[in-house]
């Protein structure tokens, strides 16, 4: 500790003066400076390099909790505080969610919304028990594209999605059709807001035909559809805020890659024990048939 203090203060005071004041030799200090690093320092260096690799593989998204989880799954025994310290020293920071609620809901007062069957209780005991759905927009230099998603509350997996250039009932129907085709639920609650695409006659008829029970929260209250909003918050800070899309095609490809290449198969969730939605489903022994994603026609 004495030599470390001298190292910190030598820019302000002569080394020999500091050594004399602290009762140590200057030669001892200089020998300390060139001494081989400790085993702990070497281990920290090796660990920091692996942390950098994991951080880079996450495209700079992961903070210390998820990087710690990656190391744990690799068999590396290390404390979370040590990971956080090494990331701080290396200048590595994960992204932070700062999404402000943006109202995209446009209610059609001529249509009667479905009752709220969820009442903000976003819990499910198994797959295909409760789905939440919502829409958002993504800016590009050529205008907006709109994304509709269906998320399984049990595993946080995006089971249906669609991208279009208008916020229509056809857009949400495409997302619902994809979810039905992949999951084949026997009985599921589909919870959304009261936006006109969800209260439309076409959407209601499709739900009735498929045996889907529609549920709708209030207008303009993010807490009534908090889980869908949470996904969009992640999408915003991890993709939209970090990219500028020149074309709508570029945005479509980025959204596809984010959902099917990152979020579902790889992105770790604290609510799932720091594993991804796909790995969470694989870790649970169920009789639910989980199929690989299939191609669903997207609206123009």
List the predicted regions and their residue ranges.
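Charged DNA-binding/catalytic regions of mobile-element recombinases
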Residues: 1-300
């Amino acid at each position: 500790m004495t030599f470390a203090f001298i190292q910190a203060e030598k820019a302000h005071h002569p080394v020999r003066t500091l050594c004399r004041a602290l009762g140590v030799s200057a030669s001892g200090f200089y020998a300390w400076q060139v001494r081989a690093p400790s085993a702990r320092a070497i281990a920290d260096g090796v660990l920091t390099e692996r942390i950098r690799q994991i951080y880079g593989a996450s495209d700079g998204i992961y903070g210390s909790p998820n990087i710690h989880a990656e190391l744990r799954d690799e068999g590396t025994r290390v404390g979370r505080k040590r990971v956080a310290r090494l990331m701080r020293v290396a200048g590595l920071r994960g992204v932070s969610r700062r999404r402000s609620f943006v109202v995209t809901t446009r209610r059609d007062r001529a249509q009667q919304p479905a009752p709220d069957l969820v009442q903000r209780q976003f819990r499910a005991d198994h797959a295909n028990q409760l789905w939440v759905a919502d829409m958002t927009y993504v800016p590009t230099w050529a205008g907006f594209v709109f994304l509709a998603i269906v998320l399984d509350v049990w595993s946080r997996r995006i089971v249906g999605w669609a991208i279009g250039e208008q916020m229509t009932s056809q857009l949400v129907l495409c997302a619902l059709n994809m979810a039905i085709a992949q999951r084949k639920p026997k009985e599921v609650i589909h919870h959304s807001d009261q936006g006109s695409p969800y209260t439309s006659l076409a959407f209601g008829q499709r739900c009735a035909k498929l045996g889907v029970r529609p549920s709708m929260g209030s207008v303009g209250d993010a807490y009534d559809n908090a889980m869908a909003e949470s996904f969009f918050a992640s999408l915003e800070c991890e993709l939209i805020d970090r990219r500028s899309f020149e074309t709508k095609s570029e945005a479509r490809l980025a959204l596809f890659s984010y959902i099917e290449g990152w979020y579902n198969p790889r992105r770790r969730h604290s609510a799932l024990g720091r594993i991804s939605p796909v790995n969470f489903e694989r870790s649970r022994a169920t009789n639910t048939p989980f199929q690989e994603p299939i191609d669903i026609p997207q609206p123009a």
